[in-house]
């Protein structure tokens, strides 16, 4: 307890965690999430929790209050994650000093990705190919 001007107050300090994982661990691993969505296209990362939650709800028609769902928004060298914990939102932010994220810049939509795709994204790899290899049928070759 500290005393200032005869008022007593306590400042509780608690590390925010999600399922026992620290916030910095969360953006490096995809564990603990039921689903992961990325916002393809461009997002204004000056937006805070309310602005990002409104993108999820109104642009993508998804529920930002669905528990254990990670929504990702990306700039070239920074990424924000939004998670509803059941009683509050948690906003995660990561900025790279060197390099950039290889983010799908297709039309503005929410893409559900796998934990493996998430790991690739965090390593700077492209997860949505611009020119995917197409299946060839033998009858088309002759």
Where are the language model's segments positioned?
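Polybasic/polar functional segments that serve as interface/processing modules
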Residues: 2-142
